[in-house]
Amino acid sequence: MRGKLLPLAGLYLVQGLPYGLQSGLLPVLLRAGGLSLTRVGLAKVLYAPWLLKLAWAPLVDAQGSARAWVTRSTAGLGLVCGLLAGLPPPGAGQAGLPAAVAGLLLLLNLGAAMQDVALDALAVQLLEPAELGPGNTVQVVAYKLGAALAGGALLALLPTFSWPQLFLLLAATYWLAAALAWAAPALRRLPQQPPSEQRPHTAHLLRDVLAVPGTVWTAGFVLTYKLGEQGASSLFPLLLLDHGVSAPELGLWNGVGAVVCSIAGSSLGGTLLAKHWKLLPLLRSVLRFRLGGLACQTALVFHLDTLGASMDAGTILRGSALLSLCLQHFLGGLVTTVTFTGMMRCSQLAPRALQATHYSLLATLELLGKLLLGTLAGGLADGLGPHPCFLLLLILSAFPVLYLDLAPSTFL
């Protein structure tokens, strides 16, 4: 199994680089180059290709092997980074992002989204059912480490590395990963698709995908299982900021602490699944723990506004609030790994010619569910007030626990 997990770890690590690059490193580079905050924010439009993953997933299924797609897309990402290294960085006084840089960053997102589709399809084909738990732990942890390296470690190198040097370093990393994808023995042993399965019936593609056992239920679950959690994780740190917690302290707990706890939770999820814990009972237990954690966090939100409540340094309330952030990220990482294992198990039931499309559908719905409440939570808090908003988030977190009672046998 190690021969499979090590190359997957390397590939998922580089898959996380574009997210870290554009969420952590790029905004600082653009701002340091003199762009306004508005212009820096508008650069997020370049994420658009990620919303279209499902459009080219059938192409990955129909043309060539997933290994070939991973190799080509990863090498292409290295080429784009090499071209970016040859362009001057945004300079002071520029009205916006230079067109050439913006175009290459758009290509970077396109290649990264295509690599995401192909790599998930590769993992679905490569891993045996007993390997899904450790495999999904590798997926989640390596991706988060890659994002942290691009958004944090490279950011720390800014004083000594120039724009060209940073992107040349990224290009070399991608080319090494492409060589790994092509040469890894475990990936070379993947069976080729039979010619009859090379091209799915595109006219009925969605119907064929939804006909895979357990797909409709799994789609509903992945769309809703993070609603309450994402809303709370977006709002709670801001409420703590409003009540006197400093931005640096909040950054430490909700940044470094959150990543460490999330990785620990993901690792525990993979360990429990590797020890042959049943997926559905484990998921039910974790969701109940998460619901209890959110209930405690909701109680803290109510207590913050009571007369005499103090968030001064050293108080029990302050410590409880900061620890609740870490607890929710730990449980969030745990539930993510278990859920991704269920998604991959469901996609393995699809014909090989549909697996990339099938998993991309589930992954897109999972992302949509996370973005939905993360985006709307602020508006709900402003419109309803923090107390009713957190009660609503608590109800939304209870829904997946009840929804598990309808789980099909394929999710057991």
Swiss-Prot record:
Topology in membrane: Multi-pass membrane protein
Location relative to the cell: Membrane
Ranges annotated as spanning the membrane: 10-30, 40-60, 73-93, 94-114, 138-158, 166-186, 209-229, 250-270, 291-311, 321-341, 361-381, 384-404
Principal localisation: membrane
Keyword Transport found: yes
Sample GO molecular function, one term: transmembrane transporter activity
Record keyword Transmembrane helix present: yes
GO terms for cellular component: membrane
Annotated protein name in UniProt: Major facilitator superfamily domain-containing protein 3
Gene behind the chain: MFSD3
